[in-house]
């Protein structure tokens, strides 16, 4: 009975795949929602960078381990709506190709939401509620239950026991290595999902927000885009274009964090931002090594 059922199910799957291949329809369930860049036309025409004839515009400045190879992606420009590739960019594998650890991502995300959280919930005890100083009735000869105050927790309008006594801080710290690893994992996940885009600069021809919206829609960058560049001063056109857009945000590379990466669908980095992130994140792997030659426990210095 089990073999017959397995054979029938197998034939059904093969039949569905054959019909979908002939008719051009998708064999996936209709209620399955996939990101548009995985099933769109632009993604189908996107060849792997390894087989490209375009020159390698950027090489990894830091030494790449012998057992690893640099990750590669396209270099694009924001000068036009068309996604013309200008070249190939090498990305350090220790930053953009680390193994995905969802537990670390979750730990960093929860920490980032809670380490500044303060709860101001506060309730009054029976000693703080107004009134209740007089005994409501005598102890005996009334037939009622004995009570000493109308502000007892047993009474309606009385004090609260074991209630919140704010302000309460939820502050705690994660180790620096865990936070750095979480940022590496988030960057690697964006690259693996084809959500990472490298541009030469943030110069756009017009400050019109519609131009940026059309560019994002034409290149199928998703519903939300995070643009990252170094420094605190950005081109005026990109600032004015993103000023009134809720789905396109721009931040400096120094403020890049796991929460912002998970909140936005696509990530756009400039070449200078890639250089800054690689230098900063790789530095954490070897920081204070001369001070700890015997591999002592990690410690931060002031």
UniProtKB/Swiss-Prot annotation:
Description of how the protein assembles with itself and partners: Component of the mitochondrial ribosome large subunit (39S) which comprises a 16S rRNA and about 50 distinct proteins.
Q: Which Pfam families match?
A: Ribosomal_L4
* GO CC terms, sorted: mitochondrial large ribosomal subunit
Which species is this UniProt entry from? Answer: Danio rerio
> Which InterPro entries does the entry mention?
Ribosomal_uL4, Ribosomal_uL4-like, Ribosomal_uL4_dom_sf
Q: What is its main location?
A: mitochondrion
| The family this protein is said to belong to | Belongs to the universal ribosomal protein uL4 family.
GO BP terms: translation
Q: Where, subcellularly, is it found? A: Mitochondrion
Name the domain of life.
Eukaryota
Q: What is this protein called?
A: Large ribosomal subunit protein uL4m
Q: Which HAMAP family match?
A: Ribosomal_uL4_B
Named from the GO MF annotations, one term is: structural constituent of ribosome
**Signal sequence region:** none
Q: Which UniProt keywords apply?
A: Mitochondrion, Ribonucleoprotein, Ribosomal protein
